[in-house]
Regions:
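C-terminal motif of bacterial Sec signal peptides marking the signal peptidase cleavage site
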Residues: 15-18
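Positively charged n-region of N-terminal signal peptides that target proteins for export
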Residues: 1-5
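Carbohydrate-active catalytic/glycan-binding domains of CAZyme proteins
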Residues: 21-382
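Sec-dependent N-terminal signal peptides
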Residues: 6-11
């Protein structure tokens, strides 16, 4: 286990990040960040994201997540699925829809109504990924004649940074696996086993793949839990996706650039049972409208807790600049959505939603991409 000590310069930098001006005049951190202190515990009954796992300042990594036990494979109705971060890959050759999510496994369906699963489709034996309890925000992409599985793993046995008055950051990375068909098995192919595609000392999650002008990029989240004002960043990958060719990630935007995003403490939201101030970035997904406008679906916290937002690129390329919509695309504690087309050519938005006291469940929504901006329609009830 490697402990990176905070220098006086590092602590000062963190304080400056918390207090530095940004594009919104209404933005401020609701609690002063003092070096070396643990974030206050959540109040009894307070809204809380991510459970109540306590963080400390002892220099130890968090307790590891419990490993998920694979449930029995069975066929269930879409409305009975319970999951976060749904991602659907339509496979035209077999007329099969493949659904992945946080947890890392796969379901499959021929009609988007009845889903069979979950199936274990990855082989990570011998990699540090085994020490993670599960893969978060799993996705499947086809590039060339191969299928790629992007998932986020969190190795809680390695501490990469002890952030003052926040929490101890574990080794968080989005890693890529590869297979010859969408059902796997997906195995490591990186230039070296356990290769870090993102900087090792960054808290990174939710990586997704995007192709533009013959180049392949990974777009990912640099977590607000580490840097207070979360960012979206990207790196360029090698043509075979086995390593990163970028010297360093490029930041696309910060959470505070979106007018609809609220600061976690100000909105009354605790995280991991602690009152950590900051602004969230989550779940990037790229899309183009029929007019060629490049957009990114992404999530954060707004007036109604978790929310789905959109940013658009003024240049039509990944380089941006990225302009945020004034209002959330979808609120009501819903987010981490993505777009896919049915085999009949219909565009559908799939997203997870949680009622006040209920679990996260996926939903289908109609959307219209015929103009320069994506327009949300009605929920699809099946």
């Amino acid at each position: 286990m490697r402990l990176l000590a905070f220098s006086i310069i590092g602590i000062t930098s963190l304080l400056l990040i918390a207090c530095k001006p940004n594009t919104r005049s209404d933005v401020k951190v609701s609690e002063i960040i003092k070096a070396g202190e643990q974030a206050p515990y959540a109040d009894p009954g307070q809204k809380n994201f991510g459970g109540f796992q306590r963080r400390d300042t002892t220099g130890k990594a968090q307790a590891p997540r419990p490993k998920f036990q694979m449930p029995e494979v069975k066929t269930v109705h879409f409305n009975d699925l319970i999951m976060s971060d749904p991602f659907i890959y339509p496979h035209g050759e077999t007329q099969t829809y493949y659904l992945t999510c946080s947890g890392g496994w796969m379901y499959k369906s021929s009609d988007l109504e009845m889903w069979t699963g979950p199936y274990a489709i990855i082989d990570i034996k011998g990699l540090w990924l085994e020490r993670a309890g599960f893969a978060a925000a799993a996705e499947i992409h086809k590039i060339g004649d191969k299928y790629y599985y992007a998932g986020t793993w969190s190795d809680h046995s390695e501490l990469i940074e002890q952030v003052p008055r926040r929490y101890n950051v574990p080794h968080n990375q989005t890693y890529l696996l590869r297979a010859d068909n969408p059902e796997g098995p997906y195995t490591s192919f990186a230039i070296e086993p356990g290769y870090d595609y993102q900087p090792h000392d960054w808290d990174c999650i939710d990586g997704t793949l995007y192709e533009e002008n013959g180049k392949i990029y990974m777009i990912f989240v640099h977590e607000w839990t580490q840097i207070i004002d979360g960012t979206m960043d990207y790196i360029e990958l090698a043509p075979d996706l086995s390593y990163t060719v970028s010297e360093k990630p490029i930041t696309m935007f910060r959470a505070t650039e979106a007018p609809w995003v609220t600061e976690m403490n100000a909105s009354g939201e605790a995280t991991f049972g602690l009152k950590m101030p900051g602004w969230v970035t989550d779940g990037p997904q790229m899309f183009r409208t029929q007019t060629g406008k490049l957009g990114m679906l992404w999530s954060s916290w707004g007036k109604e807790r978790y929310a789905q937002g959109i940013a658009y690129s003024e240049s039509g390329t990944i380089a941006g600049p990225w302009v945020q919509e004034e209002e959330a695309f979808m609120a009501n504690n819903s987010g981490h959505g993505m777009l896919f087309k049915t085999f009949e050519g219909k565009l559908i938005f799939v997203v997870h939603h949680a009622s006040e006291n209920g679990p996260r469940k996926p939903q289908y929504w109609n959307v219209d991409d015929s103009g320069d901006k994506l327009v949300l329609g009605t929920q699809i009830n099946i």
